[in-house]
Amino acid sequence: MPVFKGSGVAIVTPFNEEGVNFEKLGELIEWHIKEGTDAIIICGTTGEASTMTQEEQQQAIKFTVEKVAGRIPVIAGTGSNNTAHAVEMSEYAQSAGADALLVITPYYNKTTQKGLVAHFTEIARHVDIPIIIYNVPSRTSLNMLPETYLELSKHVDNVVGVKEASGDIVQVAEIARIMGKSFEIYSGNDDQVIPIMSLGGLGVISVTANIIPAKIHEMTTAYLNGDIEKARDMQLELNPLNKALFIETNPIPVKTAMNLMGFNVGPLRLPLVEMSDKNLEYLKSVLSKYGLLKEAN
């Protein structure tokens, strides 16, 4: 059984002056489950994990697991460019009850493909739950190549898939060809969900689902149920919104959008800052076109 199929939300982390706003996080989790979200990814890039303390990350993972209470899968972001730290966080997430892990490739260190195999092998041998690799070269300066997944599979059996955010559809096709249908591929880009699903992908780990969870669930479910035309049309319809949510570094626009929509998820953490006036006006105009802003905004 795959970790999930359909729409997994890379959920934002709401903050207040005390730190993580757990009351608001709980409200968001309940809303996502009601709206049909198929999995929750906690402590990812969109969740600003890189500017959370380790204690905050662990509290957020534990809280999410307990709040979801088995209704949908909880996938914990536990990656690090320090292998030992990634192991520690992965062991914690497993002990807290996470269903799976999302582990980014090491950033900044710029290891080799051989180093990637060693890194993920070390993490995988410390846990039993499934691991989904997160490949996002634009953030890590490192691209995990298709043949590296095959080499890794010779060493471990609980690395079950990849969140592919390279933007290279040919690379995704090659991963699918080399690894076969049992290897789970999820789009890491909201504007490539249906193209990646057409190559055997099972869904998306989505930023856009933070503001329109029902729509992303509907689109991915349509494809999974064989309604290719509906899924394609929805992808094309939503792409201008996807573009607006990446006009500045994620999660700046999506968190701004959520606050504009009345979700009150609080501030960004430095070094992320508020949007420029020009980009903010553009974001507002796009949100308005999709009927996502109240008249007061």
Curated annotation (Swiss-Prot):
The keyword Iron does not apply. It catalyses: L-aspartate 4-semialdehyde + pyruvate = (2S,4S)-4-hydroxy-2,3,4,5-tetrahydrodipicolinate + H2O + H(+). Its EC number is 4.3.3.7. The keyword Cytoplasm applies. SMART domains: DHDPS (SM01130). Pathway: Amino-acid biosynthesis; L-lysine biosynthesis via DAP pathway; (S)-tetrahydrodipicolinate from L-aspartate: step 3/4. GO terms for cellular component: cytosol. The record marks T45, Y108 as: Part of a proton relay during catalysis. PROSITE patterns: DHDPS_1 (PS00665), DHDPS_2 (PS00666). Disulfide bonds: none annotated. One of its GO terms (biological process) is diaminopimelate biosynthetic process. It holds the Pfam family DHDPS. It is found in: Cytoplasm. The active site is at Y134, K163. Homotetramer; dimer of dimers. Catalyzes the condensation of (S)-aspartate-beta-semialdehyde [(S)-ASA] and pyruvate to 4-hydroxy-tetrahydrodipicolinate (HTPA). Belongs to the DapA family. This is 4-hydroxy-tetrahydrodipicolinate synthase. The lineage of its organism: Bacteria, Bacillati, Bacillota, Clostridia, Thermoanaerobacterales. The gene is dapA.
